[in-house]
Amino acid sequence: MAIPEEFDILVLGGGSSGSCIAGRLANLDHSLKVGLIEAGENNLNNPWVYLPGIYPRNMKLDSKTASFYTSNPSPHLNGRRAIVPCANILGGGSSINFMMYTRGSASDYDDFEAEGWKTKDLLPLMKKTETYQRACNNPEIHGFEGPIKVSFGNYTYPVCQDFLRATESQGIPYVDDLEDLVTAHGAEHWLKWINRDTGRRSDSAHAFVHSTMRNHDNLYLICNTKVDKIIVEDGRAAAVRTVPSKPLNAKKPTHKVYRARKQIVLSCGTISSPLVLQRSGFGDPIKLRAAGVKPLVNLPGVGRNFQDHYCFFSPYRIKPQYESFDDFVRGDANIQKKVFDQWYANGTGPLATNGIEAGVKIRPTPEELSQMDESFQEGYREYFEDKPDKPVMHYSIIAGFFGDHTKIPPGKYMTMFHFLEYPFSRGSIHITSPDPYATPDFDPGFMNDERDMAPMVWSYKKSRETARKMDHFAGEVTSHHPLFPYSSEARAYEMDLETSNAYGGPLNLTAGLAHGSWTQPLKKPAGRNEGHVTSNQVELHPDIEYDEEDDKAIENYIREHTETTWHCLGTCSIGPREGSKIVKWGGVLDHRSNVYGVKGLKVGDLSVCPDNVGCNTYTTALLIGEKTATLVGEDLGYTGEALDMTVPQFKLGTYEKTGLARF
């Protein structure tokens, strides 16, 4: 299909939000020409996308499906430079993310303080997006006819129930639906963005773009194309200038211009959307001139208010009789053949899950809060106390070692994956040149507010006790835990001798061999009390008592290991142009997502969020996509059923297969 040079609507960026926006608007009126420009490659029927269980591959440093942005050095990370990846493929994060179905809290959207963005306004759009493929007792808050599928996947590792028993013994109650918009403290069997009927990942591009292009001819897809700048004519966004995603000729860049008759929607993501605006002349005039760009609209908030969820991992050894995904991701050919054969036979087995089977959202008890430093206690009172639907931390269990398996010995593992839901820290990103390929000035602000440390330390202690109460537990991976003093009761321990011998087998001559005393095996746990009916009543290892020196070790570990959760947002915030309590540097968009100071230009991606959301952000990205498409439709004069913008269902067997030669 030939690509025209002029469209009615241009959507710049085919990520989770952009794919939704383009697909919906192409189904608003099939006489509208909609263009979708994406920097990454097409994801159509790409096995590295649709096979859920191989998602870690997309996060390797040589990944072709992600771009990696390196920050400035930070004293809050012990001098480290943070690496923040962003998806670089059609579908954006929905093509390569962890597939965790998590909703924000009702107060999250109310806190946007923007007309039309209250949770009561947005709930119909949340329901419109999803097909909830599990039994539930609250159908009034879920959708059952949407293009994106939600299920438990078609496989569950045994670690799920072990984790839930352990968290219950800690006073974290099991909740049937932790994503009900109001529950902020509980544990659940975690749902996934996986289609139960097929075992495939449920990504935004297949759901909205490919399904539409198969059935209608008014949606045009332009991949491997980077947005350089937006061209403004007579106060209106009229066109966009693009370049190839990778420079073909550094001395003579190849530009191409596409025009839009009615609307341009910028959806390049939290990192790239502000950079596009800045190259187009929108931003802080002082910073724009310093970068060699003529200011067009004075909007100091562009690129400010950068937020993320701060993540760290703590891995543990598990007993050899339990199941994990370690042998599969390590490259055991026999295991891989068995797993792939099962999935291709019927869409089930370990490939039909992400291995993240259960997790918690938690708030501290009054006693736990009293033990945290005063700065966080004050922050808690200001931000959390009157919003009981907001969790402070999340952690979940991964059925294997999440990391580079060439760096650890063979064996079986489990990993605790934590993230801070509402950091107080803020960062920024700005262009350094008009060149679209230039490296930006990037300070993500990780941990630059002291109030963020206490809940991170608390969650490490909390999840460690969860691990120690699990039947799977066989010791810490000591290289990936805080370096506690040798004499501390909190120090990490290797596998116990019995487990080492079980892994080694009768012919192994060195299992349990110790070099001096710099590593120690796990102390033998207390025996089971057979008088108890359920194992979650049995405390196998006593709770650890941490002293001040131990806390410093945890803090240092967090500074050295905290990283992005791929959940960044906020750099093109909705808010008053003059600023507000939550948008201190000034809003970039009005409540209808219009960029201040220009006509015909909206932003529709996670960068619009003025404040954080307590969830894995794919849910919010889809919600923003749905909201933006509705706003555009309304602005164009459509009403009633036309705004349903129903997309066709994606069906297998009706599309060409794409090769993997470039991967």
Swiss-Prot record:
Residues annotated for FAD binding in this entry: 8-38
Cellular compartment(s): Peroxisome matrix
Gene Ontology molecular-function annotations: alcohol oxidase activity; flavin adenine dinucleotide binding
Family annotation (Gene3D superfamilies): FAD/NAD(P)-binding domain, Glucose Oxidase, domain 3
Top-level taxon of origin: Eukaryota
Cofactor field: FAD
Pathway: Energy metabolism; methane degradation
Pfam families: GMC_oxred_C (PF05199), GMC_oxred_N (PF00732)
Entry EC no(s): 1.1.3.13
Alphabetic keyword roster: FAD, Flavoprotein, Methanol utilization, Oxidoreductase, Peroxisome
Induction statement: Induced by methanol. Subject to strong carbon catabolite repression.
EC primary class: oxidoreductase
Primary subcellular site in the record, as a coarse category: other
GO CC list: peroxisomal matrix
Any one of the GO BP annotations: methanol metabolic process
Catalytic-site annotation from UniProt: 567 (proton acceptor)
Motif (Microbody targeting signal): 661-663
Catalysis performed (reactions): a primary alcohol + O2 = an aldehyde + H2O2
UniProt key word Flavoprotein: yes
Domains: entry comment: The C-terminal peroxisomal targeting signal (PTS) is essential for the efficient targeting and import of AOX into peroxisomes via the PTS1 pathway.
The protein's role, per its UniProt record: Minor isoform of alcohol oxidase, which catalyzes the oxidation of methanol to formaldehyde and hydrogen peroxide, the first step in the methanol utilization pathway of methylotrophic yeasts.
Family to which the UniProt record says this protein belongs: Belongs to the GMC oxidoreductase family.
Subunit details: Homooctamer.
Protein name, UniProt field: Alcohol oxidase 2
Species: Komagataella phaffii (strain GS115 / ATCC 20864)
